[in-house]
Amino acid sequence: MVEHVDALPRSEDADILSDDFPTNTMPYVISASAGTGKTTQLLQDILLDLLNRNADEAHSSIRESLIITFTVAAAAEIRRRLEQNLQYAILYARRNHGCQPGSLVLLDTDYQLGGDDSELARTILHDCHHAQTVFSVALNDLPTVQISTIDALSKRIVDRNADTLPVTPGFQILADDAMKNRLRGQTLDALFESWYDERNSMHARFMDVLDNMQGPRHDGDLRATMMSLYDKALTKPNRIGWLSRLAEPYRFNIASLNQVVGGEYGNEYLDRYFQGWIDMAEHPLAELRSCLDEALASCHDAHTAQQDTVSLRMICDLPQYLRSESWNAVRARVIDANPLDVLPKRITVGKTAILKSTAIAVPKDSELGRRLAETVRGIKGIVSDLQSKLAFTAEQVDSLDEVAARRLEGLISLITTFDQQYALAKQQESVAEFSDVAFWALDAMQQPDVAKRIGAQWRYIYVDECQDNNALQNRFIREISRNAAKLTMVGDVKQSIYGFRDASPEEFGDICNSVTDASHRRELWVNYRSVPEIITFVNTVFARLMTPNMGATDYLKEQLQIGSAKQAGKPFDAEAIELLVSNAAPDLSADVVADENGTDTAPPVRADKDELQVDMIVRRVQELCEGPHAQYSYGGIAVLARGATHFADLADRLYRVGIPVEVQGVGDLYRQPEIQIALDWLRIISNRHQDVPLVAVLRTMGFTDDDLARIRLHNRGWLFDVMRRIAESGGEADESTVLSSDVLLAKISAFLRIYDAACDYARVHSLSDSLWHLYAVSGLFDFAGNMPEGERRQANLRLLVEKAGAFAVAQERGLQPFLDAVTMWSASGSGEEASTVPTKNAVHIMTIHKSKGLQWPVVILMGASNNLLTGSRTAAVRTIAHQTRNEDGAVAEYGEGALSLVDQRNHVRVDTFQRAVIDSRAKELEAAEELRLLYVAMTRAERKLIIAGSYRPGKNDDGNLNLRTMAQGIALSGDGRTIDPRTVVKNSGSPNYLYWILGSLL
């Protein structure tokens, strides 16, 4: 039986944010923008450092360099480019040996060294012989240089120090998410079964938390919430300790406060909650006060008028009351003495506004009357909103907060217990997650001898794509560079798009801001990728949208600068930016179509707004690449989108018109027909008495419905056994009947030969080898290759073999365990389909995330009008990071969370103000991430950028598209320069890229 282990908050659980690097490793930072060549600059710095540290004849090998990047593919690309740069630097030094700067034989026209006037080129030319020697040695040593991801580097450190760590010998890493989720699921299954037992000490706490998920029927929601919080905690240096203060927002007493907002002992969540209302209400309430003062100024009986407008002035003073009175006192003003009851008695709002008073009369058609009418309409909603916020007494709110805190504490306990049991399960299976390896590596680097050895091995550390690192990875970088001679960090906060992995772009921004020494800081804003028209457009959009409060950077300080000398003197291209919007209004005239005989037919199939947008994009691609005025090749066009929902439809429509396509990750691997056929083969090999997969396999072998019916009529029992008896009897039936077709008997015999061969092979070979054998004897691999998109389908079959091999190494051996795992992976959607084989001249279709680091002549941003920011509406518990200062003065980070209280028995749901505040902040963070995604998408284009979306015109638009109407609702902040961050998140509809772009332009 699993027992409860309390998760008590401890000071040592804090994530200490000691961003102060040791004096000898104050980082060198390269802060860059898109298309400015930041990785190129990093490679040049590596070569320059290598020359400088060998200047005094002291040998310093390139093996002392450690290069860290974000992905395995990026690491391979850096190694390739570094090899090219070394080869070119050697050639540059050899060809220019003895030359004066003005008469060089070989010019650096491609800027591999940064140009002939760069510091690297000048250093090479200062002593060409020395440069040749240094770079030649470095080129020979390059294969041994550590260029890798943090995950791979952590694994290396752990492997070399395993004897000092709690590591299971021979452990395997759960690199496949599906396999990881399988082991997690098994652990959760066992825990939930024990927690449902009333005798378990965790039962009451478990059921209390489960009640907030609407009861046992929704325990899947609890599992999802636990795993979401668990994954977030694993990106923090303090692991589960990051969750220890999750309930902190609920740990205070409202009834003891003398004032609701701004009190000495107040609560920041309470202040934020009501400050938002004050910010919204102050202007309309000030306008109401102005109207009252104007009316009183012309009144003949001021004393009586003052008496008659007391209740109205009380409404105007509500912000002041929130700052000076207790919760219950303010509540009495807006609930007990309901001003909404008084308001209609004093002011009638219709075509005109009349202030009802014995002493005051406002003319119906006066300017004051119209102002009063407009103001009162808004005030009703404002007062009603405050009433909803103060619906409960302070004592009731405190009671609700106690329940919320208790449930969050219970959730922490459940996650802590899971963490312990999951650790045991991983130990028993001899497996580990990447996060486990990272924490082991951090533990190893805390040991003095290990730290000393690492410091001696890697003296010069270079980190690329720093904006995508999470808190745990940033801690790793600080630890591994503690004894280094130099640390260089490269990144662009504007391109941080991995919030779903809990990336922390703000931390890299803070590091950049902390580096005040100009010699340690370099800024790259000159864009060499895009034409000036695109650069100007991008700057215009993001100068208003991206601010320190929305996007984590001040774009005006980092805006792109035009750097393409090739564009000098060229005329302005008005078509470099296109807005491609499909009219999503229903075409009523096409609802019923009559054929030539007068018979009504169904409306056109392609009528959905997303289908219309796909068709519009297909037509535009044809126009760009076909006909006498074609300027681009298919391979020069990329279609990018936030998600892959409509990729299959787009690829299909492009294929239909003869346009080649390269799609990355479209659809679910386990739903592809070739994979289903392979799995059905495995199922009947594992257990031949499964008629459904057997029939599916037989159909692929050419069996018709008539053939299957004849087999079934032949005898009763399992279909496979019937076929075996038919083959053994030569087609004779038990009742003196024979199969009418020798062809059918031949089909059965051929199938059984293949089946028996596959079974015999599978008994003595590994699962992955058995799959390759099955592909060969059944002809499945060739069959898939001859289907439409054959290369992609064969890639899917290869991926299934890889998954089978990885499963056998990291999990259980055997066919049936693998099939059980596949069933679970398929149900959970854990299988992304393999991409198509890269094609030189094909339209590229991919998500914005996968496009990072790439570029094309033409980029089409698809789905720019799709809704964003849906996450805050689905999560049962939302969290934000909260920094505090410990007793020793160190800054620590914890997670703080909030939820909506649910009473499943009474079917009651109460939204807490803490949840409202955290939801608001979380939506702002989501919006900032989406802004950065939009920036990445728009900066992939070299010559043409096309924004594609759809729009449904309003009733007053006469069915026509109106750009100003499309952008209606977005507002400028008080400085008139940037967009108010709140309007980026909150508007009349759900935010989308098209809304933001048009709002920033109009």
Language-model segments: which ranges?
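Conserved motor-region signature of P-loop NTPase helicases/translocases
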Residues: 2-80, 84, 98, 178, ...
